[in-house]
């Protein structure tokens, strides 16, 4: 299986911040990687484009991917509402690791987070399935708009997304 590369064009209050590219680990985690890839391209009729990063905690992560509600209270995958944890072997080794948000075992949907630090306490609990390949500095810049209480000071949006 090919490890696809997707991109997110990020804006802050409508102003361009930059483009990040993300390599997906489809060779080891194919179902999760395919969900993310298809949500990035929009080929199933719904996508990440226009959704926001609603939760940012400096020194931890940036969370987004709720394209049905902008507040993180919903989740939808290309497989239906939720899908099972596929492979928990990848570790949360540091900044740029892409992982699934969940509400417990086997509750993956569309929400994701990008680590901004090593988060080993998430190993074995959240599916890590990709890594920022280029422009991790954009993710680090997003951190500046977050607070310890997870609120954001500005609207951080995925203005466009797709596959290279």
Curated annotation (Swiss-Prot):
It is an enzyme of class 5 (isomerase). Its main location: cytoplasm. Pfam families: Pro_isomerase (PF00160). GO terms for cellular component: cytoplasm. It is found in: Cytoplasm. Keywords: Cytoplasm, Glycoprotein, Isomerase, Rotamase. Glycans are attached at residues 71, 108. It comes from Homo sapiens (Human). It is one of six related genes or pseudogenes found in a cluster, thought to result from gene duplication, on chromosome 1. GO terms for molecular function: cyclosporin A binding; peptidyl-prolyl cis-trans isomerase activity. Residues 7-163 form the PPIase cyclophilin-type domain. InterPro entries: Cyclophilin-like_dom_sf (IPR029000), Cyclophilin-type_PPIase (IPR024936), Cyclophilin-type_PPIase_CS (IPR020892), Cyclophilin-type_PPIase_dom (IPR002130). PPIases accelerate the folding of proteins. It catalyzes the cis-trans isomerization of proline imidic peptide bonds in oligopeptides. The gene is PPIAL4H. Its EC number is 5.2.1.8. Belongs to the cyclophilin-type PPIase family. PPIase A subfamily. GO terms for biological process: protein folding. It comes from the Eukaryota. This is Peptidyl-prolyl cis-trans isomerase A-like 4H. It catalyses: [protein]-peptidylproline (omega=180) = [protein]-peptidylproline (omega=0).
